[in-house]
Each structure stands twice: as C-alpha cells, then as structure tokens.
C-alpha cells in the first residue's frame, strides 16, 4: 500500500525497448488502473533546474521518422496489427493530467542544493522527448529546438506511453530534470541524477495520495 492505494512498482532499465517490454509485461500481469511514469531526464529547456519535475502534456519519440540532410522528419510508423499506424507522440490521460495540474498547488517540494545553491524545485507542465540517445550532438540539439523544443529529454517514456495507449491503459509521465542536454552527459548525470530521481519520486508519491483522495470522495 502507498498513500492508501495498492500499487506495483517496476524498474524499466534504460532505453525504449526496455521501457516497452516492461510496460507490456506489467500491464499483462497486474492489470493496473493507471500507469504513473516517474524518472529523470536531461534539461533541454534552460529555465528548468535540477529537481524541477515536468508533468508531460505530450511525450514524443524524437527518433521516429526519416533522418534527412535537413534533420528529422517525424512520421507515423506501422504498428503490430494489420493496417495499424502508430504515432510519434502521445498525450496523457486527460483525467490524470487534470488531477496532476490541480495537485501542484498543494505540493511543497523538498529543498535541494545544487552547485552550492539551495532552492525548492517546482512542478510544472511541459513536453518530454525520448529515444535511445543518452547524449546528443549540438546539431541534434539545434534540430530538436527548431522542430520540437521539448522541456525534458530521456530514454523510455515515449515507448511506455505508446504501449499504454495501444493497450488502453491510462498513463501520465513525470520527469525531473537532472543535467543539461549535451553530447557527453555521463559525469553531470552521476552528480545530479539522484537529486532528480528523488524529486520525481516525491512528487509521484504525493500524486498517488491525491488519486486516493479522489477515489474516496
């Protein structure tokens, strides 16, 4: 039990294939009422600080489509069923998104200290992009900024959102910013990843309690 609700937690591992596989097995085995995705991501939006948690309003496969000399051209691809096409982006469940937006006002994040500066992280709505790329080049960053301009980049949520959507399970994605988006994030992620993961987890636990309160009304 967590905040009055029966929950099952699963660790996906890194990457879109792992995210999709674990989500499909999770749904098949446990038949969840909804799926909450909690984790970290690099800060594409410079206004997002380490520990700020983004409620995803749109979760994007940023490597789905054609890679041309002018950068990515995003497009649908064929799904597992005959005649089915899958999108390159997914929206969260409207009910969960409405509840998450409303829950922000009552949430007080734990203070963090990053690079000697103490502050209280925020929770805000934004867009999340995902692929199997851990680091991305300056050229890729420029292309992403011109075409998508996401707030957070990570490696699983688009695949998780796709599986949830195709299997008819409501979902919502929460990702806290860690390091800035860059070509070689390893050292920065090791320094900042735990702070971001803890921030996302605290918000997710709080939101779980909000879901419990709604059910009891």
Annotated model-derived regions:
Residues 12, 16-19, 89-93, 153-154, ...:
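Solvent-exposed, acidic/flexible segments
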Residues 181-217:
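His/Asp/Glu-rich mid-to-C-terminal helical/loop segments that flank catalytic regions of hydrolases
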Residues 130-173, 182-183:
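A C-terminal functional module that forms or caps the active site or interfaces directly
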Residues 34-36:
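Structural motif
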Residues 45-147:
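Mid-sequence, gly/pro-rich, charge-dense loop/helix-turn segments that line enzyme active sites
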Residues 20-24, 52, 97, 201:
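Extracytoplasmic/secreted envelope proteins and their assembly/folding machinery
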Residues 1-30:
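N-terminal short beta-loop-beta anion/metal-coordinating cradle
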């Amino acid at each position: 039990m967590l905040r009055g609700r029966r929950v099952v937690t699963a660790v996906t591992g890194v990457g879109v294939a792992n995210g999709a596989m674990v989500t499909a097995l999770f749904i098949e085995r446990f038949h969840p009422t909804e799926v909450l995705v909690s984790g970290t991501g690099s800060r594409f939006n410079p206004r997002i600080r380490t520990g700020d948690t983004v409620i995803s309003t749109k979760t994007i496969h940023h490597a789905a489509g054609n890679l041309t000399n002018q950068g990515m051209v995003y497009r649908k691809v064929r799904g597992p069923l005959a005649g089915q096409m899958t999108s390159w982006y997914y929206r969260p469940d409207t009910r969960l998104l409405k509840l998450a937006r409303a829950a922000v006002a009552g949430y007080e994040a734990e203070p963090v200290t990053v690079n000697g500066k103490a502050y209280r992280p925020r929770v805000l709505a934004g867009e999340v992009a995902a692929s199997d790329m851990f680091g991305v080049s300056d050229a890729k960053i420029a292309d992403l900024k011109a075409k998508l301009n996401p707030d957070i980049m990570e490696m699983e949520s688009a695949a998780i959102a796709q599986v949830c959507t195709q299997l008819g399970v409501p979902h919502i994605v929460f990702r806290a910013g860690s390091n800035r988006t860059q070509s070689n994030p390893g050292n920065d992620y090791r320094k900042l990843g735990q702070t971001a993961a803890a921030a996302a987890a605290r918000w997710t636990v709080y939101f779980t309690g909000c879901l419990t309160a709604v059910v009891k009304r």
